[in-house]
Amino acid sequence: MQDGRLSIERAQMEGKNKTYSLVTGNITWGMLWFAVPMILGNLLQQFYNIADTLIVGRFLGAEALAAVGSAYTLMIFLTSVLLGLCMGSGVVFSLQYGARDHEALKRSIFVSLVLIGVTTLLLNIAVFVWIDPILQLLQVPAEVYILMRDYLWIIFGGIGFTFLYNYYASLLRAVGNSVLPLVFLAVAVVLNIVLDLVFILSFGWGVRGAAWATVIAQAVSGIGLCFYSLYRFPDFRISRQNMQLKWATVKEIATYSSLTCAQQSVMNFGILMVQGLINSFGTAVMAGFAAAVKIDSFAYMPVQYFGNAFSTFIAQNFGAGKHERIRKGIRVAVRVTLIFCLIISVLVFVLARPLMLIFIPAHETEIISIGVEYLRIEGAFYCGIGWLFLLYGFYRAVRKPGMSVVLTVISLGVRVALAYTLAAIPGIGVWGIWWSIPIGWFLADIFGWCYYRMKQRKSLEW
């Protein structure tokens, strides 16, 4: 164990494989310094689908845009299984790194690789077998069906690359390195945009070209980050003595990963159900929502991944037993999130129409109006989703991932129930779907903060 600890600490002193401890130093600057590369990286990650949406919407038309936009929602739901497993494993890595137990960290790396690798394979098989029933369940219109099916077949053929990138990104962030994932993602984003233009404009491959561009870019980021991480961080290399499926390690990884996976899956299943309701309103609403939700996701992405950085901060300090530092960190995170969300809310409300015009030609007035309405309703309440991301990260980090699932069920349950109820009322329609989303956010916030005040504020020992 001592050798493992010295290896990483020596790398820190040499500055080659830089990691960042969040258990000492100024809390505000430490959290922001660690969060910025994560925020930039995940803003860049949005370009994977935004590049497809922008180019497809401009050059292939509304039907292709509706196909790619709806496919994105399904992709997020299905890949949330992998992302949840990676995030759950990352919490365990952070706790063990905070406690400086590097032998346990290596065992966890092996167990999580086996668990997530097998899950990736099973998910791939499931998509190829059940893609048609899934699309039928989503009520995908006939004019969009084949385009969406072709896009998804290609995307999920490369899902292993998505696993590689997110796994090693989670591992690196757990030990305090949020820069390397950003570097490899930036390369992939540039490649994705270039290949989009080549495959769609030069080769005429249509929606399939957009899918291939994304898969190739993900392959570069996933394989590249994997090999570079193993090269630069010897402690990530697993030896034969670490290849032990000890029950305690398996249980810890499986518990965190499965609950985080459940949270991500519930979250995206709810979104998928709302997408099915939106699809029933026709191609114009689908296209308007597809463009607007990209802008929406891009706008609140910084607070989503600030929440992940906050979770790493909490986990490292929880592992190190620094509970008072955790309480101070909570106050800092709440203030930072509120300030950022207020700024973004004003910008999105004012710039909603110009932002829609980036994706949709000016003559498509109905689609633009639908998107503007969505953005102005959601954008006014970003602080609700910002605080919810903090709650998710907090409860994962203090060994209560089940509470994150409860909050997700509340948020998404309210959203789905209200959306279907209000949309059926004459004169409300799609407007009711838009309003159901922030209402779900705030009800989950209230429950999560009340639970913290009753239980967690008194003691961080569960």
Name each region found by the language model.
Residues 2-35, 93-158, 202-258, 314-381, ...:
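Short alpha-helical transmembrane segments in multi-pass integral membrane proteins
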Residues 22-60, 73-88, 92, 117-124, ...:
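N-terminal transmembrane alpha-helices
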Residues 32-52, 154, 165, 188, ...:
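Transmembrane helical elements of multi-pass membrane transporters/channels
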Residues 47-66, 135-142, 198-205, 265-294, ...:
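Helix-terminus/linker motif at the lipid-water interface of multi-pass membrane proteins
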Residues 62-73, 152, 211, 283-298, ...:
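Small-residue hotspots at the loop-to-helix junctions and early N-terminal turns
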Residues 65-125, 162-181, 288-352, 385-399, ...:
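Small-residue-rich hydrophobic transmembrane alpha-helices
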Residues 77-80, 192-196, 222-226, 298-301, ...:
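Hydrophobic transmembrane alpha-helices of multi-pass small-molecule transporters
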Residues 86, 154-173, 181-189, 210-225, ...:
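Short runs within selected transmembrane alpha-helices of multi-pass transporters and secretion channels
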